[in-house]
Curated annotation (Swiss-Prot):
GO MF annotation terms: tryptophan synthase activity
InterPro entries cross-referenced by the UniProt entry: Trp_synth_b_CS, Trp_synth_beta, Trp_synth_beta/beta-like, TrpB-like_PALP, TrpB-like_PALP_sf
Keywords associated with the record: Amino-acid biosynthesis, Aromatic amino acid biosynthesis, Lyase, Pyridoxal phosphate, Tryptophan biosynthesis
SUPFAM superfamilies from the UniProt entry: Tryptophan synthase beta subunit-like PLP-dependent enzymes
Modified residues annotated as N6-(pyridoxal phosphate)lysine in this record: 90
Pathway: Amino-acid biosynthesis; L-tryptophan biosynthesis; L-tryptophan from chorismate: step 5/5
GO cellular component: cytoplasm
Quaternary context: Tetramer of two alpha and two beta chains.
Keyword Amino-acid biosynthesis attributed: yes
Cofactor: pyridoxal 5'-phosphate
PROSITE patterns: TRP_SYNTHASE_BETA
Family per similarity comment: Belongs to the TrpB family.
Name by which UniProt lists this protein: Tryptophan synthase beta chain
Amino acid sequence: MYAYPNELGRYGEFGGKFVPETLMQPLKEIEQAFNELKEDPAFEQEYLSLLHNYSGRPTALTYADQLSAYLGGAKIYLKREDLNHTGAHKINNALGQALLAKKMGKSNIIAETGAGQHGVAAATVAAKFGLSCTVFMGKEDVERQSLNVFRMKLLGAEVIPVTSGNGTLKDATNEAIRYWVQHCSDHFYMIGSVVGPHPYPQIVSEFQRMIGDEAKEQMLKKEGRLPHKVIACVGGGSNAIGMYRAFLDDEVDLIGVEAAGKGIDTPLHAATITKGTKGVIHGSLTYLIQDEFGQIIEPYSISAGLDYPGIGPEHAYLHASGRVQYVSATDQEALDALKLLTEKEGILPAIESAHALAKAFEMSRTMSEDEIILVCLSGRGDKDVHTLMNVLESEGKTK
């Protein structure tokens, strides 16, 4: 029976708290509040009510019949997190942490964001709960995701562009943590993925677990059996953990797809487990992309939500234990998968989600028609239209 993390916030050897002394007490307070509230039926009811009435859960499980027929292999089902309010799975966690912050008496939210989806979700729940919101976002991502930046500002959030490093998610997270150290008395840091020091990976995992819980129930209702493979994209890894949680004790192949960028044999990728080694990043022992001197190597992906140089400690454990297989998809493979799903099913996925789709399509062709693949469609692609337009038009691939 799967039972992690332990009382020290460890997943095997991974996880833990590697933070400045000034953050040990705030983390302890968050852990204590979370442990109390997750056992409180009133808190659970309030959270579930918000998911249902505000975010629109449960999300659909869609059989991609046209796509499955075209590929000629396994039946492909999509767990439609793109149908959530704000367009991705990020709202699940944001609502839970906003409730936690409010119960703790915090009036200000700090968040980091890459693709902008967690930033939008944080700004959305801050508006809903009457909290102030400060979002740190890498300068590169601000430019790539200008529409989401505008949405955050429209929702009343302050967006702070981060110019250090590559100006991406890692750098935004660094600045958000620095800011929190200085303002932890009245600010709540709302981490957007299953990363960071304990108890954050556990908190985010708990607030995303309904993805897999719903999908499992829906699959049994539709097919009367479990899928053969469950596939999700992995950056920090929250949509994947949310999907995997329900299947960890079942005989189901679990597959995580990292961003291979221009190729894992080039320096331009974000394939942390495929190419990384053990180290500490943002308060947690995990795998990360680093050089022989322990310096972070800047990750790259066409997807702003996947170019993180680390990975959640639970993923590190699931890799080390062999329970989950981690593979990677290139920019081009993701773009091709995105176009194919859009053309065959009329569903425009986020570029992040398209990495999972790419591997699902590849694996489907080697499987029989009575086998099932379940893919987590973590978000919609509206935010990526500008990027897609530039890339595909330059390649002459739009019709």
